[in-house]
Amino acid sequence: MYEKTRICECCGKELVYGSYTAWCWAEKNKTICKSCASKKRAKRLNDLTVLLEETPETYYWMGFLLADGHFDEKRIIVGLAEHDRDHLEKFAKYIDFEGTISLVKRGPYCSVRLSAMDTEVVKKLREKFDIKSNKTYNPPKTLNWIPEKLFLCFIAGLIDGDGNIMNFHKRKDVFIRIKQHKTWLPILEELGSYFGETGRVKINKQGYAELYITGYPKIRELKRKLLEYNIPLMPRKWGKIDLNLKTKYEKKAETYAEIEKLLRLGVKQTKIAKTVGVCESTVSKVKKLFIR
């Protein structure tokens, strides 16, 4: 039996021909294997390769997808509440999605859904970020390989996907909370370590792992940095963080610093109290604390 082979220029697969004529025709026309030909004919409805880039927005979306998306072997599926449709549309634009964003109704609730397929890219993403199909119970082993700048964007994506930014009771300052299955505890500890003492991790009474980020100056600085990276933060969450707001502790520290400055310049305590807008006992207290 006649048998001659050649290599597919696209994937490197060996192609076998049963006649010399067939081999000559294929060689002359530089034909490729059926699988590669099928992929070329298929219309691309998205470009997931952008999610392999080392950019702030890519890492933001990967954090978001790790929290709120689903990865199977071939595709990425994202479903959000209908009121967050604009955010899903931003993701669709980022991956050049040309398919349909579906509206899903379940009783009184409506959600929007997007499914983007690319077997090769999804495989690479799952390997790069250690993502399993049942990621709710099997999180990545570690995220500490991500550079700091991109790590912050990744955290922001997680917050927008599975976190909350909430006000303290009867206060204008906020705290951030991320709640996950208890198997996520090591990952939340990695995230919390970036924020030092203001990032606390615990297992709550229901058995979930929770990360709390407190300390308004740290949260305010986080938002400032993220705005520099021009990533698509959710306004309904990050809008709660007022960059001009100062806590009572910050205001107190500034007042004490101003009093100390005037004391060292030799200004009388009565005049300092009037200038700064405090009582003389406060000036005396600062003098005892800082002036030796």
Mark where each language-model region is:
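Internal intein/HINT superfamily modules and their associated LAGLIDADG
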Residues: Y2-R292
